[in-house]
Amino acid sequence: MARVKRGVIARRRHKKILKLAKGYYGARSRVFRVAKQAVIKAGQYAYRDRRQRKRQFRALWIARINAGARQNGLSYSRLIAGLKKAAIEIDRKVLADLAVNEKAAFTAIVEKAKASLA
């Protein structure tokens, strides 16, 4: 049986990791052992932050809606309760966009929510 050395496979593995580490600072982009750790950690951060992004955007939308609602004399929670009572189904992403870019439309929605609460 012939002796099989792993040079080709090792090079392929190293190249794959170093390609993923391209753009990293210093040894993290040049030294395989360090690059491998950096790539693994980057993957962990990416996995975690894909989930955090959803939470962070929802929090941002709520903050924007709350600011817009308070300009119209209503708190965020009262606005959402009013929208539910009025059977207006607009998600927070769209509401936040309206609060920032279409103030007149947002004010009209707030007035409908107020009317359903009264």
UniProtKB/Swiss-Prot annotation:
An MF annotation (GO) of this entry: rRNA binding
CDD domains: Ribosomal_L20 (cd07026)
Keyword Iron: no
A single GO cellular-component term on record: ribonucleoprotein complex
Keyword Ribonucleoprotein: yes
Keywords associated with the record: Ribonucleoprotein, Ribosomal protein, RNA-binding, rRNA-binding
GO biological process assignments: ribosomal large subunit assembly; translation
Matching Pfam families: Ribosomal_L20
Cystine bridges: none
Similarity field: Belongs to the bacterial ribosomal protein bL20 family.
Function: Binds directly to 23S ribosomal RNA and is necessary for the in vitro assembly process of the 50S ribosomal subunit. It is not involved in the protein synthesizing functions of that subunit.
NCBIfam families, A to Z: rplT_bact
Protein name per Swiss-Prot or TrEMBL: Large ribosomal subunit protein bL20
Source organism per UniProt: Pseudomonas paraeruginosa (strain DSM 24068 / PA7)
